[in-house]
């Protein structure tokens, strides 16, 4: 099999690395890729959101299968375009994209199928929003754009002025969803879907703020697996996963591909926060190093609707993923900073037990690695428990150095007692 992965972030580097470990592929391409993927695959300088360019690349390079890692190609119709032309690819078709791309649609879907979600209200008028907030003075809310937007585009606050100022900036282009603030443990549930069942990947817990109580980001770290009590795991299946899959089939939105569910474990039980129709970053960087099953075996099972028969082989170890970001992120990152040289052996991710390095906002320029975005490198430590994995991740981050680099110092801490 000859495979093309669409994307250029750290998540896509991790996915490409997973494919590179397969015994069943004889060609691996990434579009457009990055400095990390070029050592394990052939990077293709095309726009992954342009269906015609992707199709032409598949034809030119005899590509059999396309894996959509990043969200942009999903929302430009790449999957439907390729499937119509006989190229295998799995992922949410246009009819299912509203699960992620329209939060109000998603909330109505969960309401129809009795899936627990935060209390929520849709607003398209700032005056009505203002009146609502004044009636609930002092309460803490989360405000997000109704349309698809980066996860850092949100606010979690009890301050009227802050909530209104943020909401006005969104309402110019999209309605907003106002939700109750939930207290609890955030987890990320990742599923492969086919027409008859699903395969659950190791559950992660992501750190989405710049610091505890800080600004929202695209994700600053993740741990895997999450130590959940058996009754909580069963509640996830009974109240969220199974009703979601039933709803997808009932509403003719079922598809073969990835579904990621963001959940908060509260004292009321698991509550669904968001759906994503692709892998999440940085959860993917955390779970990929732990999975021993060949990804092509999983995809073949998906193709033949036999996912439920797959016994996923997962390491008994733990992983801690740590994101190194540019100064200024999550606001306006200061880019163009040169990374200190890294040993080639580390960049290749070839040594068992060594930290993994997955590259995001970094490009090679004049023989040097230069930052090009907010989140630059994800360092993943693997260890016999979360504490040991944490130690390995923070030892590994010492090799990622550039002016203004920063990262959270507490990834995994909340799980040490377990």
Locations of the language-model features?
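ATP-binding N-terminal substructure of ATP-dependent carboxylate-amine bond-forming enzymes
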Residues: 1-94
């Amino acid at each position: 099999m000859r495979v093309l992965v669409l994307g250029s972030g750290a998540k896509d580097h991790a996915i490409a690395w997973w494919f590179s470990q397969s015994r069943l592929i004889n060609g691996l391409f990434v579009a457009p890729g990055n400095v990390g993927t070029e050592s394990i695959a052939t990077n293709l300088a095309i726009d992954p959101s342009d269906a015609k360019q992707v199709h032409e690349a598949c034809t030119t390079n005899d590509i059999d299968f396309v894996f959509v890692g990043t969200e942009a190609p999903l929302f430009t119709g790449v999957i439907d375009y390729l499937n119509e032309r006989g190229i295998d690819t799995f992922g949410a078709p246009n009819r299912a994209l509203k699960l992620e791309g329209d939060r109000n649609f998603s909330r109505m879907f969960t309401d129809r199928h009795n899936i627990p979600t935060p209390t929520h209200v849709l607003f398209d008028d700032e005056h009505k929003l203002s009146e609502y907030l004044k009636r609930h003075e002092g309460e803490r809310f989360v405000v997000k754009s109704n349309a698809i937007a980066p996860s850092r585009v949100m606010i979690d606050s009890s301050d009227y002025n802050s909530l209104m100022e943020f909401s006005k900036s969104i309402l110019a282009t999209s309605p907003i969803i106002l939700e109750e603030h939930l207290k609890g443990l955030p987890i990320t549930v990742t599923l492969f879907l086919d027409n008859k069942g699903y395969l659950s990947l190791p559950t992660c817990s992501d750190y989405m703020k710049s610091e505890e109580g800080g600004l929202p980001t695209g994700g600053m770290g993740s741990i895997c697996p999450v130590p959940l009590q058996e009754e909580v795991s069963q509640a996830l299946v009974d109240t969220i996963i199974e009703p979601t899959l039933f709803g997808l089939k009932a509403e003719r939105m079922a598809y073969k591909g990835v579904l990621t569910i963001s959940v908060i474990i509260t004292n009321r039980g698991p509550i669904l926060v968001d759906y994503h129709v692709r892998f999440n970053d940085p959860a993917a960087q955390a779970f990929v190093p732990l999975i021993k099953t060949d990804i092509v075996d999983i995809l073949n099972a998906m193709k033949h609707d036999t996912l439920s028969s797959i016994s996923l082989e997962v390491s008994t170890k733990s992983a801690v993923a740590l994101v190194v970001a540019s100064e200024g992120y999550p606001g306006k990152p200061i880019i163009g900073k040169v990374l200190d040289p890294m040993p080639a052996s580390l960049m290749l991710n070839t040594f068992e037990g060594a930290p993994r390095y997955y590259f995001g906002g970094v490009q090679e320029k004049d023989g040097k690695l230069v930052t090009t975005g907010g989140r630059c490198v994800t360092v993943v430590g693997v260890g016999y428990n979360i504490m040991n994995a944490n130690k390995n991740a923070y030892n590994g981050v010492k090799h990622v150095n550039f002016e203004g680099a920063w990262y959270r110092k507490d990834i995994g801490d909340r799980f040490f007692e377990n």
